[in-house]
């Protein structure tokens, strides 16, 4: 009798052990399946991010570097563009243009064989249009177009010599919406740019004219009616 009871207890213990092992195996398999599904979901999310977020970001950076199209129009910019289009190219008569004194300017030469070989930086503050008038009437040129890092550096250094924070250069924003683009007022090719971080489209950037900063030499957008020092090329 005791032997039969002992055998029954042993059989029950073995059955319980097998049941625990099967349960653990089932939980392990379920866990692996869950991890596999999570991995597929993460991979799918990565692919979605790559196609839906990273590509537009690259396009935005490309547009930013090239001075390409911004999509939203600032009402102040539109008003500024209308004002510039409605008025004459030169907003000062000959009697209003006073050519600068020698102590107010720094001159330097461009590269040998260049199309635009002479540059001048002037410390007398003018609006963008007034500065363009001075460049045309006093130097028979235009606000400076910059086509290389070397010229950009020379304008920056000249600005520091005159102790001015920013100078107008000849870059100007034209167009609306996705057709916005920058151009040089002298009509030369827009083939070089040196925008500051976040310029010209990101953040709270506005204004249709371009300034060069004496600190760092980077470019920023600015409202054309602000009076600043400026640089001419001729």
From Swiss-Prot:
Q: Which cysteines are joined by disulfide bonds?
A: 135-232, 209-224
Q: Where is this region: Disordered?
A: 26-96
Q: What Gene Ontology biological process does one annotation of this record name? A: immune response
Q: What is its main location?
A: cytoplasm
Residues carrying sugar: 69
C-type lectin domain segment(s): 133-234
Q: Which PROSITE patterns did the record assign?
A: C_TYPE_LECTIN_1 (PS00615), C_TYPE_LECTIN_2 (PS50041)
Instruction: Give one GO molecular function term.
Output: carbohydrate binding
Q: Which domain of life is it from?
A: Eukaryota
Show the stretches that span the lipid bilayer.
none
Q: Which UniProt keywords apply?
A: Antibiotic, Antimicrobial, Disulfide bond, Glycoprotein, Immunity, Lectin, Nitration, Proteoglycan, Signal
Skewed-composition ranges (Acidic residues): 71-94
Q: Which residues form the propeptide?
A: 16-115
- Which InterPro entries does the entry mention? C-type_lectin-like, C-type_lectin-like/link_sf, C-type_lectin/snaclec_domain, C-type_lectin_CS, CTDL_fold, EMBP_CTLD, Eosinophil_major_basic
Record note on modification: Nitrated.
Question: Which residues are the signal sequence here?
Answer: 1-15
Where in or outside the cell it occurs: the entry states: Cytoplasmic granule
Q: What is this protein's function per UniProt?
A: MBP may play some important roles in the allergic reactions and inflammations, since MBP is capable of releasing histamine from mast cells and damaging the epithelial cells of bronchial tubes. Antiparasitic and antibiotic.
Name assigned to this protein: Eosinophil granule major basic protein 2
**The organism of origin for this protein:** Cavia porcellus
């Amino acid at each position: 009798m005791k032997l039969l009871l002992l055998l029954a207890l042993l059989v029950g213990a073995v059955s319980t052990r097998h049941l625990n092992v099967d349960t653990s195996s089932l939980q392990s398999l379920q866990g692996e399946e869950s991890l596999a599904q999570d991995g597929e979901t993460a991979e799918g999310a990565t692919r979605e991010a790559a196609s839906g977020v990273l590509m537009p970001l690259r396009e935005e950076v490309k547009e930013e570097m090239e001075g390409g199209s911004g999509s939203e129009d600032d009402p102040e910019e539109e008003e500024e563009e209308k004002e510039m289009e409605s008025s004459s190219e030169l907003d000062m008569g000959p009697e209003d243009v006073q050519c600068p004194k020698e102590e107010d300017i720094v001159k330097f030469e461009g590269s040998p064989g260049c199309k635009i070989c002479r540059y001048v930086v002037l410390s007398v503050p003018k609006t963008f249009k007034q500065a363009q008038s001075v460049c045309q009437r006093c130097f028979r040129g235009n606000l400076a177009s910059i086509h290389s890092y070397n010229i950009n550096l020379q304008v920056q250094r000249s600005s520091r010599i005159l102790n001015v924070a920013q100078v107008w250069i000849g870059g100007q924003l034209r167009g609306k919406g996705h057709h916005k683009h920058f151009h040089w007022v002298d009509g030369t090719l827009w083939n070089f740019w040196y925008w500051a971080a976040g310029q010209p489209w990101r953040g709270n950037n506005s204004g249709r004219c371009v300034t060069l900063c004496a600190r760092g030499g980077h470019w920023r957008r600015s409202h054309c009616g602000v009076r600043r020092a400026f640089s001419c090329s001729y």
